[in-house]
Swiss-Prot record:
It comes from the Bacteria. It comes from Geobacter metallireducens (strain ATCC 53774 / DSM 7210 / GS-15). It is an enzyme of class 2 (transferase). Catalyzes the specific phosphorylation of the 3-hydroxyl group of shikimic acid using ATP as a cosubstrate. Monomer. This is Shikimate kinase.
């Protein structure tokens, strides 16, 4: 598979990756940005940098509503950028304002995976505050179902189950080239 940089169509201002935690947004985002010659922006990393503490710490100290407000500020900030691949947090699309800003900012690509695949990918991670006490398939399935209507709003959806990062990036770049 070719690993060279490709040119995104001029109509593509940004590429926004949405999806549940563990669907590959960060891994795909970094490689996609490299391939497109775009910058990579991770919303959660921007929040951590701005607050000076981890997302787990933000949740513990201030709760989810405070985190979501910070997330909306980060979405506002990146929505003004150009030539970025943006990885959102899994819950960023819950907010109607965020969804609107993201759609206006670029091509929204939703990454999906089966509940089993997400559980496998998240098994060893400890930085997921909404799953801190419950990493069961039932909890993950319920959260995915709650968010499905928001994820379905994307321009392109890709199931990452059983696929390599390179394969997912190739699907996205193929879509962008044909757009």
């Amino acid at each position: 598979m070719a690993t060279s940089t490709i040119s995104a169509p001029s109509s593509v201002r940004n590429v926004i990756l949405t999806g549940f935690m563990g669907t590959g947004k960060s891994s795909v985002g970094r490689l996609l940005a490299h391939r497109l010659g775009f910058r990579y922006c991770d919303l959660d990393a921007l929040i951590v940098e701005g607050e000076g503490v981890s997302i787990n710490e933000i949740f513990a100290r201030h709760g989810e509503p405070h985190f979501r407000a910070l997330e909306t500020e980060a979405v506002r900030s990146v929505s003004r950028e150009e030539r970025c691949v943006v990885s959102t947090g899994g819950g960023a699309v819950i907010s109607p304002e965020n969804r609107c800003l993201l759609r206006k900012a670029g091509v929204v690509v939703n990454l999906t995976a089966t509940v089993e695949e997400v559980c496998r990918r998240l098994r060893e991670e400890t930085d997921r505050p909404l799953l801190k006490d419950d990493r069961s398939g039932e909890r993950i399935a319920a959260m995915m179902a709650e968010r499905e209507q928001f994820y379905a709003d994307a321009e392109l959806r890709i199931d990452t189950t059983g696929k390599s990062v390179e394969d997912v990036v190739a699907e996205i770049t193929g879509y962008l080239e044909g757009r």
